Amino acid sequence: MNSGIDLQASFIESLNQLGIPSGAAKALWIPFPSFLMIIGATVGVLVVVWLERKISAAAQQRIGPEYAGPLGVLQPVADGIKLVFKEDVIPAKADPWLFTLGPVLVVLPVFVSYLIVPFGQNLVITDLNVGIFFWIALSSIAPIGLLMAGYASNNKYSLLGGLRAAAQSISYEIPLALSVLAIVMMSNSLSTIDIVEQQSGYGILGWNIWRQPVGFFIFWIAALAECERLPFDLPEAEEEIVAGYQTEYAGMKFALFYLGSYVNLVLSALVFAILYLGGWEFPVPLDKLAEWLGVSEDSSWLQVITASLGITMTVLKAYFLVFIAVLMRWTVPRVRIDQLLDLGWKFLLPVSLVNLLLTAALKLAFPVAFGG
């Protein structure tokens, strides 16, 4: 694996230099990733919610949030405070333990997945050598929480929503994993940092989107389905099943579903940017940038600037994808459940298998271009 800026190792080493033993330093590190994940993901969600409401308003020729802060930027905060103080109701015949555990199982894996996301030039909380596999494994836990929430609510609409969520997740998780496997095959690594490093050196031409155009579309469609974004929001289709598995929820439990949905959208966009859009890499190669600026490629200030701007590049790519997902909400109709399942099993699955086999063949035929 590449020697990047591993926050865990750097944090422990810094405390050791201050005279703190390694055991105590590791104990101090334990709550630190959780703090970073919660703060970063929550801020990201607040931005996405505000963007979605403003974009939705523009699509419908409305103003949108306006009074809570400048341009209504504090409206998501106001909504969050409102949900915190709303009454937490548990239906009389619901299973209270499963009813409470469902939202937790939906949110927790998504937050933990941020551990392996490199936000900048090798800037990652924990650089796992199986990082991308870790993300796929965690993403398979959330549907269990959705099914649990639907079953525990003792409501027919909630149960239908939970069953739809489970069926949808199973149908699209396999094509998504196969499209990621093609990237892993080219990168010869499951580390998210190694995957980005494999795309470096050639600017925009080195990004995996050009070598994996089919996988690019498979991943995008499957990610939208996993996030339950239109046109794949069947588990909570208001016109058909009220609010799906969320029907009986209120207060903070409802807020957890709401939070998990948007955190998952931002996470999927970040992973998408890492796999296909070069992560923190610039569209222009670093040597060309140094040549245009008339400085050495090894210049310390150039390295600092590019490392700092790398974080901005990762976030900009992710939010561009979020913008497209939000825009799709007002441009495409919702599909039927049979169309949803047919698309996953009869089209995306075989195409993703063919794409994987084709990638293996190209890797053998053109090892330089496809990571042989």
From Swiss-Prot:
PROSITE patterns listed in its UniProt record: COMPLEX1_ND1_1, COMPLEX1_ND1_2
Keyword list, A-Z: Membrane, NAD, NADP, Plastoquinone, Quinone, Thylakoid, Translocase, Transmembrane, Transmembrane helix
Keyword NADP recorded: yes
Domain of life, per lineage: Bacteria
Localization per record: Cellular thylakoid membrane
Its membrane topology: Multi-pass membrane protein
Major subcellular site: membrane
Gene Ontology biological-process annotations: aerobic respiration; photosynthesis, light reaction
Catalytic activity as recorded in UniProt: a plastoquinone + NADH + (n+1) H(+)(in) = a plastoquinol + NAD(+) + n H(+)(out); a plastoquinone + NADPH + (n+1) H(+)(in) = a plastoquinol + NADP(+) + n H(+)(out)
One GO CC term, this protein: plasma membrane-derived thylakoid membrane
E.C. designation(s): 7.1.1.-
Family in the record: Belongs to the complex I subunit 1 family.
Subunit text: NDH-1 is composed of at least 11 different subunits.
NCBIfam families: PRK06076.1-2, PRK06076.1-5
Protein known as: NAD(P)H-quinone oxidoreductase subunit 1
